[in-house]
Amino acid sequence: METLRFKGNLTALSPIHHGGSEDYGTTKLILTLPTIIVNPLNGEEEIDNVPAIHGNAIRGYLRRLIMDDFLTLLDYELDSKKVYHFLFTGGILEALDPKDKGAINLTLKKKIRELIPPISLVGSALGNQMVQGKLKVGMADIVCAETKHYLTDYDDYNFSAYNLKGSDFGTRLDDLKEERDDDEQAHQMKYEFETLIRGTKFTHEFILEDCNDVEKSCFRRMFELWKERPYLGGKSSTGYGKVKLDYPEINSLSDDDYLKYVDENKELICNFLDELVKIWK
């Protein structure tokens, strides 16, 4: 058994919007999680809702980056919705026929791990087969006065989580003139959303479990793709969510083995993808 940990830090270079499940009127709130904190005023422990970035948000973004890159390296055009979801969204478990009793096809799982290294890292489901990912993506924990007792490297960090929250707004404008009279004004709706302000810091961790050399190299490739498009959260198309990545230990890995493997096995991998597409059209 081998476990590799890569601890790092994220710093917001532009406001981050990572929406939670709740709204307040027309305001979209950021994700907060109940946390035992130390009240900075009296030093006593209490429970409060503290902002965080969900690990699934980071994992999902990295999945899309590495899978798009994987198909580009193969010059492969995918023609199956189910296989697309298998590669890009985590897939769907389903029975293949009424007689399916949930039997696991070990040969298929082995070929998936061998020929699609990104899936071996992030996991997925196809038909009745589930492939567990070897990559664990932690939550990005905000660095603030309320949580610094969890963080050994930030003893002197005194910004409250409440001071790190911001807000912004946008408008939706109905400009379809043909649907209203000439003297009628266009309807405009204002919406608001919470953000975490520029300069907010997070601690974060990746864990690789029992990965072979190609899978480790694939992880490095994934991280390099993130560095090329260093965003997190929503509304990145309008400038939100740009982050500075600082994971010095990942520099010990190289993406050479992964790129070489994909190049040398391109035909074999494409044929396997064709097989999957025929079964799960």
Label the predicted regions:
Residues M1-K281:
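RNA-binding basic/glycine-rich loop and surface signature characteristic of RAMP-family CRISPR effectors
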